[in-house]
Amino acid sequence: MQTHRAPERPSGADKLEIAVNAYSKTPLLDTIRTPDDLRKLKIEQVRQVADELRQETIDAVSVTGGHFGAGLGVVELTTAIHYVFDTPRDRLIWDVGHQAYPHKILTGRRDRIRTLRTGGGLSGFTKRSESDYDPFGAAHSSTSISAGLGMAVARDLSGGKNNVIAVIGDGAMSAGMAYEAMNNAGAMNSRLIVILNDNDMSIAPPVGAMSAYLSRLYSGKTYRTLREAAKQINKRLPKIIANRANRVEEYSRGFMMDGGTLFEELGFYYVGPIDGHNLDHLLPVLKNVRDMEEGPILVHVVTQKGKGYGPAEASADKYHAVVKFDVATGTQAKAKPNAPAYQNVFGQSLVKEAQKDEKIVAITAAMPSGTGVDIFNKAFPDRTFDVGIAEQHAVTFAAGLASEGYKPFCAIYSTFLQRGYDQIVHDVAIQNLPVRFAIDRAGLVGADGATHAGSFDNAYLGCLPNMVIMAAADEAELVHMVATQVAIDDRPSSLRYPRGEGRGIEMPEVGIPLEIGKGRMIRQGSKIALLSFGTRLAECEKAADELAAHGLSTTIADARFMKPLDTELVLKLARDHEILITIEEGSVGGFGSHVAQFLTDQGALDSGMVKFRTMVLPDVFQDHDTPAAMYARAGLDAKGIVAKVFEALGKDVKTETVKLA
């Protein structure tokens, strides 16, 4: 197939001279509105653009916070790709998308770059609705090659000639989905360019002039033509001689290009490794790759996280994601916490339980610090397992441990646990194995937006037989629920808790297992009943105070369990109150739906005994903002709860508030 080639750059005297502002810190970058402007520059000016792009990225993230190290690591690569390829006609897909801030600056979004991850501002990831230069959205890892192959096949079917480029990191490459896609791509032989951004040196040997020279050689047309001719001759040779010739070619390339054998076996033409910060190496290789005419290609690029900013280079983990910081010192503006973070409470509680029970083990899928498993790892390194970006494997690995009498705690964000759903059903629930799921980031998560929201676990776990489902109302409840999970040894269980800090309440010294399927009364009233599942309990208390000011006596109950449901508590609330409202930090199909199903089956709603309402997340994917703003928009704050009560009473909350005043 004939590939699309970007127009050749003008040379010599035909090169465009771009007028720049000598007083700006980024004079050349200031002239670039889209990659079309970048492609008008002389090659020697591209280095300056990259330097200025790095400075702009540093300055922008210092104002907004966000993912930092990954973006700095791909500044030269981003610049080179947009210079060589004809984006957006050539499709450029960033795996995960957290490294795409420089890409956004070059593709017409620089004027909004300081709105990153704020309400109404730019997404922290690639997003189709944001720009034509984001042909495929992302935030979860290891999807780029599959999406890219789909685009490449669509191009072939429609007779197109554009390139498709997928940029994927070595961490994301560890996930099974990436290899499934590569295996399929190699078999289909469609034109697809995969750029492996190796920023952890986990695959690559040292790079330098020899590697760059060989990469240019092997990606060049002369070598490829000779190689193809040799293949045709080889077909006419006796099989034994042909096999030996193949081995000679494989060994010679494998010896010089160590690391490419696996990709060649998957059907990719391997080029690299090359220095991802050296434009003299990157540009000619990418140009050669652009002009290749058939088959999938993998370009192995070695980069450094945090490149060009000293503090980030010295501490890649600390600067992977940052809050606002001082550019001169690197000091991050972290406010002193008012209460412990939920993931830390989980980690500390699990350590205390493990000190008493040697069968307890912890599993994480590449998120040890985010889940609190790093705390457990410090105390019990031999009982901690980070399986990488492999949620499917993590779940079944935990099931295997449980089948042998161990007590695995599988700590995974709600949004990422979705990736292991079949394993939860097939390997855990059907076999009734006591895997303990610690579901972090339940509910809305703020700046990371819809892709990271933990909206659906109540619904997707609630339909499974044998599953115990709990939600912590506060950090003290979390301690007791960890102890409860330890005690549940006859079936699987899940415990959900949100991102961020707790309420700052008094903490128990040790966790005490709760009675399974029993909630608790928080405040006794007579007219209105608020039944909370999770950390909306604090908003229910605020709402009850406001309702009391309107003369409405309000009961508050904490359900604690969604499965098994505290049916006695639900019936009591329904019989003793005029209005019953459930409140949860999850989608339709969760806790409220289970309560509604029970009340309906009991006939409790037939005679109008109680006015029943549910409060759930809206049936939309909410854009990023602060968690408080997102919950307010969803109507799941105290104000929204009060409004729901007045709606059920057939009254207007605004009118009632005026009367009260």
UniProtKB/Swiss-Prot annotation:
HAMAP family for this protein: DXP_synth (MF_00315)
GO BP field: 1-deoxy-D-xylulose 5-phosphate biosynthetic process; glyceraldehyde-3-phosphate metabolic process; terpenoid biosynthetic process; thiamine biosynthetic process
Binding site for Mg(2+): 170, 199
Protein name (database record): 1-deoxy-D-xylulose-5-phosphate synthase
Subunit-level organization: Homodimer.
GO molecular function: 1-deoxy-D-xylulose-5-phosphate synthase activity; magnesium ion binding; thiamine pyrophosphate binding; transketolase or transaldolase activity
InterPro entries recorded: Dxylulose-5-P_synthase, THDP-binding, Transketo_C/PFOR_II, Transketolase-like_Pyr-bd, Transketolase_BS, Transketolase_C, Transketolase_CS
Binding note for cofactor: Binds 1 Mg(2+) ion per subunit. Binds 1 thiamine pyrophosphate per subunit.
Name of the top EC class for this enzyme: transferase
Pathway noted in the entry: Metabolic intermediate biosynthesis; 1-deoxy-D-xylulose 5-phosphate biosynthesis; 1-deoxy-D-xylulose 5-phosphate from D-glyceraldehyde 3-phosphate and pyruvate: step 1/1
Keyword Metal-binding: yes
Native organism: Bradyrhizobium diazoefficiens (strain JCM 10833 / BCRC 13528 / IAM 13628 / NBRC 14792 / USDA 110)
UniProt-listed Enzyme Commission number(s): 2.2.1.7
Annotated family: Belongs to the transketolase family. DXPS subfamily.
Domain of life per record: Bacteria
PROSITE patterns: TRANSKETOLASE_1 (PS00801), TRANSKETOLASE_2 (PS00802)
Record function comment: Catalyzes the acyloin condensation reaction between C atoms 2 and 3 of pyruvate and glyceraldehyde 3-phosphate to yield 1-deoxy-D-xylulose-5-phosphate (DXP).
A matching Pfam family: Transketolase_C
Binding positions for thiamine diphosphate per the UniProt entry: 98, 139-141, 171-172, 199, 309, 391
Catalytic activity: D-glyceraldehyde 3-phosphate + pyruvate + H(+) = 1-deoxy-D-xylulose 5-phosphate + CO2
Keywords: Isoprene biosynthesis, Magnesium, Metal-binding, Thiamine biosynthesis, Thiamine pyrophosphate, Transferase
Cofactor(s) needed for function: Mg(2+); thiamine diphosphate
